Each structure stands twice: as structure tokens, then as C-alpha cells.
Amino acid sequence: MSETKNPGDHTLSVSPTKTLSLKRPVEAGIVRQSFSHGRSKAVVVEKVKRRALGEPHVLRESAPALDVVAPAPQAAPPAPTQQPQPRVASRPQPQQRSSSGVILRSLTEEEREARSRALSGAHEREVEERKRAEIEAKARDEREAREREERAAAEARKREEETRRLQEAESKRRSESEAKRRLAGGEPAPAGANAAPRKAPALSAAPGSAAPSGQPGPAGAVGARPAEEEDAAKRIIRRPGMPTKVIVARPVKGAEQKSRGRLTVASATGDEEERTRSIAAFRRRTQRLKGHVSETKEKLSREVVLPETITIQELANRMSERAVDVIKLMMKQGQMAKITDVIDADTAQLIAEELGHTVKRVAESDVEEGLFDSPDVEEHLISRPPVVTIMGHVDHGKTSLLDALRHANVVSGEAGGITQHIGAYQIVASNGLPITFIDTPGHAAFTAMRARGAKVTDIVVLVVAADDGVMPQTAEAISHAKAAGVPIIVAINKIDKPDAKPERVRQELLQYEVQVESLGGDTLEVEVSATKKINLDKLADLIALQAELLDLKASPDRPAEGTVIEARLDKGRGPVATVLVQRGTLKVGDLIVGGSQWGKVRALIDDKGVNRQEAGPSMPVEVLGFSGSPEAGDRVGVVENEARAREIAAYRDRQKREQAAARGNLARGSLADMMSQLKTAARKEFPLVIKADVQGSLEAIVATLEKLNTDEVAARIIHAGVGGITESDVTLAEASGAVLIGFNVRAHKEGRQLAEQQGLEIRYYNIIYNLVDDVKAAMSGLLAPTLREDMLGNAEILEVFHISKVGKVAGCRVTDGRVERGANVRLIRDNVVVHEGKLSTLKRFKDEVKEVVAGQECGMAFEHYQDMRVGDVIECYRVEEIQRTL
């Protein structure tokens, strides 16, 4: 059997000399690569061809694109690739003999069917791969055509740019040469010669313009550039004693692409020379366009509310600007600032207007705007109970009269039987009318309380004792009522006493312009007896009549407003304020502001001790929930949120501190006053630390003690507060050397123990008279006593003796009175006092004596004085100290 294999023979054979392989060997060749300095390197180059399934013409067209590396010249020509031809096993093939002489057996029917199925499947796969190859070839052709168009367009743009540049250079050169020629020939320059050269003509009409796509451009336009590049690529080396050597730099393959950056598939396979736009450049351009759009966007202008002072951070927040921009603007104006710095309203307005915003200026007091005195809706107004204040002199029976009306006993609970704080109660009269009563103290120390009671009242009941008449506090109560503009009802009390004289009371009231009805006036009057309960119903009827004339109305359907009647610090409940609701309805849970304190209503307690959920107009209640004890007389209002409550309280607290500082400045006075105070003796101070049960009593104590101040001594109140005596109070009193006083309060256990350890006495009082008297006596002890001279006698100097170790001694005769040893003396010469001092020696016949009476002679010597002459008169007297009182 022949060893030669026929081209059309596709039978499998086993060769003893060759190995059976599934792919043909790779064709390889060796290429020597040269480097600088004579170095070279042998590189093995392999050529790999991918087997493609398809028609012969498709394979021929796509074959050049499948080459990855060009074939080396040393490579042997490859053997022809055999294409598998599909065969149909229709008939059994005869047995054939292989090249080795081995006879192969014929295929069975199952094997032929399996081979047929395999061939049909291979044929289907070939068809699918052929279609896929056609699609890929078509897409590749389109991509290559598009890339060729892009490269052609890029080359055209490049040629146009080069042509335009050359034309501009040529035009510039011609204009310069023309100008030089004219200057050299002395010809005048034409008009416009110094102007800029004319614009180059259009590219379409330029002689060196780029040719249409696909046609070569003129040689003159781009012919010079390769020559220049060739000259630049040459390097001449001259060495002494050796011939000149010219080295031409070889172009490095792929150097241009490496210098341009990252290579893409299109740039690696194509021949384009211009680099296309990268993704990063596209992103940067998009961001620039976005930024341009945002800059051209119209800026929003806002209305900025500016208080009197504001921080830079808050100003930036209100303008919706960055704080950095505000600081930059201030730095441009020459001001260095931080975001926490506070600026005034004028500076803030300039900044806001510079940034394009409008400004609305507000004052600090605007935080209280709308808190009080807002108008009521007429349809919501209903009748309210009258608020009646009982006023009069101390011990005229005000509280007893109120007890008789309330059927209670308040007097027994008051220390000393006098009212020392305001009490507010609501009763229902016999005629069914609810009446709110406010009981005020009658003592002189409680002037502020009476004025406060008159301001919140509708009717004043002036109580005058029939047996005592009009007293100073009665006249003061009349003044308060007239100042408040409220009507007065005169209640002549104690008519059951035998020495009662109601007519005298009526006559005395005329001195204060109070004319009762019985004397033809318009002031209502009634004679009552609190102890015997006489005419109490008549008093209630008069109050109801006066209230009906006043037509008292209020709206309960609105935020509550009221006034603090009294305030105290309770040990278990905290700050407690007695509030008289004047308008609206106060409810549990409301946010309220009173003076410089704010809080949330935790509980409402009426005068009977009953917890209530709400309190309407003219109802007095105890309010729990304040952050601190408000001051009596402060107005209370309900606000909508906690932020505004804090803002109002902070503003009032700031105002309070500023007023206190202003009072301190006024007390210091001018520079002349300060100098005069320095010249005189310093005023002695009596330091005090006072704690009281309620705000009203504390206010009265402080006001009374301030009235005791004189030019020589003053009561210095270091601290005055409401509540029990604590450790801090004891520490403060010990450090300042003050007297610690408790009025109707006691010291806590810790404070009492600390006071015992420090040896500090705590003085407790429950009657204001005793407190004021003790403080007055202590302050009187600080006063310098009054000096009074008591004349003893006179003596005349008859002779002056000089005695060694003693000095001068005057021999005298006592003319009147007596002279005592150690007494004060004056030396009078020609009716002029020349010396004041004391006697150091008094002798009679060489004996020391205590005194010498008139008509006797004696010897006298002065302390630290020797200038005595015959005829001088010695006046002897004694100084007596008399204690002063305030």
C-alpha cells in the first residue's frame, strides 16, 4: 500500500512515525532587533492563523484581518488547510487499507447514524458561525469606514489649520517687509498701516487651502515640514582627530501613541494621527457646562429679619448663604471676624444687601409683640366676676371683714394678727354673685403691695375704723385707688364699739376728696362690723351694683393673660405663683411667661386647695411649673411654643441686669462725687442676707431697710431670696461677714449644721416690726457717737518755772470751777486758742492731786507742749459721748 496520502482522502490512519494531533504546528521565525550602542536581540516571531468556517470568498476577505503578527521571512510555507466536507452515509464504504498495510473494518449501522448526526450538527453549527461571522464582518466594515471618515475629517481639519497658520505668517511677513521697504524709501505709510493686518481670506478661496477629502493638498503647503523634521532628527558628532559622524535618529514605533497617553483598539489598528477626545475631557466639559448653567441661574432674594445684634452664623443661616462667604465679604471690607462673633444690625444690613437680600429690622422688644393686650372678639365676650381689693390702715379690720365674708378665719393664721402678704380668694355672695377678693397689707412697709393690688382690681373697698378715723395708710390707699382709676366703696368698720364715730370718718374723708353719698357725693358707703357680721349682705349688694355699672366682660376663648399677685418658693413643690387670670382661660399644660421666668403649667390650685384643669377670667389660682420665682406684679401670658418663651424670658432677664447696672452707675455718681466721697470718711455698711417665705414680704423688707440708710451707715443687702436657708446662704453670710435673717422660713438641716460649725447666728422673725427694729438698733451701733463738752473750770498762769527732766511747769490759780487731772484743756492767749491737749501733771505743794478747786493755787504741765506764758488762761473741760440712733 502506498504511503502517499491523496488530497481527497479523509480516512483516519495511524502512522508509526508521526504523532496524531488536533491542530497544526505553529509557524515560527527569528527576527533580530537592533538597539542603540550596537546592541541587538533575537526575537522569535510566531504567526498564528485562526481557522474560520465559511465560504471561500469570505475567508479570503477576512484572512488579512486575522493576522496578529506579520509572517517572518524565514518561516516555511504552511500546508494547505483541509476543509471538512459534509458527507452522507448513504451506503457502506468498502474496507480500505491504511498506509501501514492494516485493513480497517467497516462501520456499523449505529456508527454511521451517529456519524451522520454529528455531521448534521456540525453543518448547523457551521451555518450559525457563518452568519455570525458575516454580521461581525459587516459591523467591522462599518466601524472601519466610520473611523476612516473620522480620520479623514481630522486630517482635513489639521491641514486647514496648518494652511491658515501659514497664510497668517505669510501675510504678517509681507506686511512687515512692506513697512520696512516704505520706511527705507521714505514713502509715507498708507492709512491703516499701523493697524492690525487684515484677516486672512476664507479658507475656501485661499491658494493654500486644503484640498477636498481624498485629494492630496498642494506641495508648497506641507512640503517644507518633513524637511524640517528630518533636519531636527539629525545629530552631528564632532570629535578631535576623528572624522565627523552624522547620526540619524530612528523613529520608534508606537512612540507617538505612547506620548499621547492610553492606546485604544481603534488607535492601535488604525493609522490616525490626531488624538480623539478622552472620557475625562468629556466629563470636564460637561461639568463646566453645568457650572455655567448654575452661575447663570437667577439668585433667590430673601427677606432677612435682623435683630439689634446677631451672630455671623445666624445671619448666614437666615440668608441661606455660607458663613464663609459672609466672612469673605467682611474681610474685603477690612473686618476680620469669626462665625461666632456678634455684629450690630447696621453691619448685618450692609452684608445682607450686598448679597442681594432685603432686610427687615426689628428691635429686641419686638419679641413681646402680640403677647399682651390683643383685641377680643365681641361675640366671645361674657360677664366676669368683679375683682375687689380690700385696703386700709393696719389693724382696721380688713382681714377680719374678709373672713366674715368668706366664713373663714385668716387672722388667726397671720403672725401678730397683721397681714404680711397678699391673699386672693373667690367667694359666692348671698345673692349668688361670685366675687374675687384681694387682701392687701396695711403696714407702711407694704406700699408696693397696695399699689400692685390697686392696679389689678376693679373695685376698692376702703376699710376705715370708726373709732380710729383716717390714718396715713388710709390716705395712701386712697391715692393708689385714684391713681389706678378704680371706684371706691367706703366700709366704716367697728361700728359696734362704744367709741365709734362714723360721722367723724365721713368728715375726715372730705380732706382727701372722697365725698360719700350721705354727704351728697358719688362714693358708696356702708357701716359694717366684721366681728358682729353687721351689714355684710349690704356690702355685697353694693359690690354687685358697682360691678353692674362697670359692665365687666372678658373672653374665655383666647390665650390667658394675668398678673402675679404673690410668689414663693415651696420646698416640695418648687416655685409657686399666685396668679389672677384677667383674660382668657389658663389650662394645665400651657406654656407661660411671667417676668424673666417661664415654664409649663403643671398644676392649678384654687384658694380652697382644689386642683383644677383650667381657670377662667377673674379667678385667682396658684400656678406650679415656673422655672423660678417670678416677681409680684409681673404680667403672665401664654405663648405658643417653648422657643418664644425662652426668647422672651432671656430678653427680660437681660433688661433686668442692664437696669441693675444702670442703678449702680447712678449710685456711683460723677467724678466730683467720687472725689468728695474719698475726702470724707467712708460710709459704714451693715451687710445682710435675707430669706423670706413670699416675694411680697421680701420686697417689703428690702424697701423698709433701704429707707434706714444715711450718709454714715447703710444696710447692704448682699442677697435676698425666697425659700429656706441653705448651705450656700450660710457660706455667703460667713464669707461676707453678714447677718443671716430668716423671715417666716427655717434653715435646712445642712445649713443649720454648717452655721453651728461656723459659729454663725441665724436670726428668725415672723413679724416685720421686730425685724426692722433689730436691724435699726444694729445700724445705730455703727454710728459715730455725738461728742458734748462739759466745762469744768478756768485757771490763770501766774508764773512759769523750768524744771530739769520735767520741762516747763505753769504756776496757776483756779479762778472758777475746778481743774481735774487727765481732763482736756485749752490754752488761750489773747482770747485765741493756741493749744488743745490734756494735763499731764497737777500738783499742789509738791503733791499729786486729782483736782483743785477755785481760789487755790497749783502747778500744771501739758502733754507734749511747753510754750506757756504768764497771763495765759487754761480752760479745763470734759468730753462726753452720747450714743446716736437712726
Swiss-Prot record:
Region G1, annotated ranges: 392-399
Binding residues for GTP: 392-399, 439-443, 493-496
Gene3D superfamilies in the cross-refs: P-loop containing nucleotide triphosphate hydrolases, Translation factors, Translation initiation factor IF- 2, domain 3
TM region(s), chain numbering: none
Presence of the UniProt keyword Glycoprotein in the record: no
Pfam families per the UniProt record, alphabetical: EF-G_D2, GTP_EFTU, GTP_EFTU_D2, IF-2, IF2_assoc, IF2_N
Domain of life: Bacteria
Pro residues: bias regions: 74-83
Domain tr-type G: 383-553
GO molecular function terms noted in the UniProt entry: GTP binding; GTPase activity; guanosine tetraphosphate binding; translation initiation factor activity
Gene Ontology, cellular component aspect: cytosol
Sequence segments annotated as region (Disordered): 1-25, 50-229, 253-272
Annotated localization: Cytoplasm
Extent of Low complexity compositional bias: 63-73, 84-106, 185-225
Location of region: G3: 439-442
Entry-linked HAMAP family: IF_2_B (MF_00100_B)
The family this protein is said to belong to: Belongs to the TRAFAC class translation factor GTPase superfamily. Classic translation factor GTPase family. IF-2 subfamily.
Role, per record: One of the essential components for the initiation of protein synthesis. Protects formylmethionyl-tRNA from spontaneous hydrolysis and promotes its binding to the 30S ribosomal subunits. Also involved in the hydrolysis of GTP during the formation of the 70S ribosomal complex.
Official protein name in the record: Translation initiation factor IF-2
Organism: Methylocella silvestris (strain DSM 15510 / CIP 108128 / LMG 27833 / NCIMB 13906 / BL2)
